[in-house]
Structure formats: structure tokens, C-alpha cells
Amino acid sequence: MNSRLVLLHGWGATSDDLEPLGRSLAAAIDLPLEVVALAAPHLHPQPPGRQWYGLFPADWDAVPAAVEALQERLKAITRHGPSMERTVLLGFSQGGAMALSSGCSLPLAGVISCSGYPHPNWQPAEQHPPVLVMHGRQDAIVPSTAMDGITERLRSDRCETISFDNGHTIPEEMVQPMLTFLKRVLKGS
């Protein structure tokens, strides 16, 4: 049975940013995995980068519409090919925040947030999908304390956290924990 991994890039990046990671995960997992890298809908102040919503200053009022728009894109994608229940959402930084806000109220197989943060008024569904939260202890862009704000809002039996010695990045040593998570949520679904 086919599965899908949807990638959400961070603020100022493009959809190409996470594609090497997605290809690496797809090559290493022993099941068919389609990789889709979505581009944020808005231009970053310094093109060609993109943004899910304005961040400097933070436009928190735009978040609900951004989340709704992303959820509609995910629903459209899953009308063909792998279902929502066979889809994992993986986001980095602002993309991680969007993955959490959008994915935790959808019937996804799982959500992976890398160096993400909780949106101010985010309240995940009680029955949210399994979540993997990864964050660097030396992250100078999104402080590692953001991980606490995420885990406080999620059910502990549905959320796994990993902190690592690095900054605002996804280091190579995090690929294996991602693979383990993907295998668990996709083979069980």
C-alpha cells in the first residue's frame, strides 16, 4: 500500500529545501513512499523565498487562514493516491508550526515537527495523530523551549520528543529516528 510524505519548508526557504531529506527517507524506508514538497503561498520579503504567513513582525492573525488553506491543499492532494490516513506531514521551523496546527486536527498517519513552535492559540484535537517533535538544544532562531510549549498541548502517549546537540537545522543523525517513526505510523495504518 502506498504512503505519502508531505514536506513543509521553513520561513524564507522554498519547496526545494526539504526535498533531499524527503528523497533520503523515501529511499531508506521499505515501503512505497511518495514525497510531495509544498511551497508556502506567500512571497518572503526577500524572494525567491516563501512564507506561510508574515513572521517579522509575526502576523498571528493570519495563522487561522493559513492553516485552513493548508488543510484544503492536503485534502485536495489526498483525493488521489494515498489517503489522509497514509500521509505524514513533516515541517521545519515555520513549516513545523504549520504541520502541527494543520495536521493535529486531521486524520493523518503522523506529524513530524523539526525546530517548530506552537502558534499562540493552537489547540490540537484530543484525538490527534502521532507526533514526533525534534529540536536542537542550541537553536538560536526558535529556542528549544518551544518544544515544551508543543508537548504541553499534546497527549503524552501520542507525542515523542527528541532534542539534539545542534542549532536550527535537521542534522543527519535525526534521519534514523524519523525513519523509525515513519515505519511505525505507516506500517500500522
What do these predicted regions represent?
Residues 1-84:
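Serine-hydrolase catalytic machinery in alpha/beta-hydrolase-like enzymes
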Residues 20, 101-102:
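Active-site signature of alpha/beta-hydrolase-fold catalytic machinery across serine-
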Residues 55, 144-189:
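C-terminal catalytic histidine-bearing segment of alpha/beta-hydrolase fold enzymes
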Residues 90-95, 99:
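Gly/Ala-rich beta-loop-alpha elbow adjacent to hydrolase catalytic centers
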Residues 107-118:
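A conserved short beta-strand
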Residues 118-128:
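Conserved serine/cysteine hydrolase catalytic core
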Residues 132-135, 139:
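Short beta-strand/loop motif that positions the catalytic acidic residue
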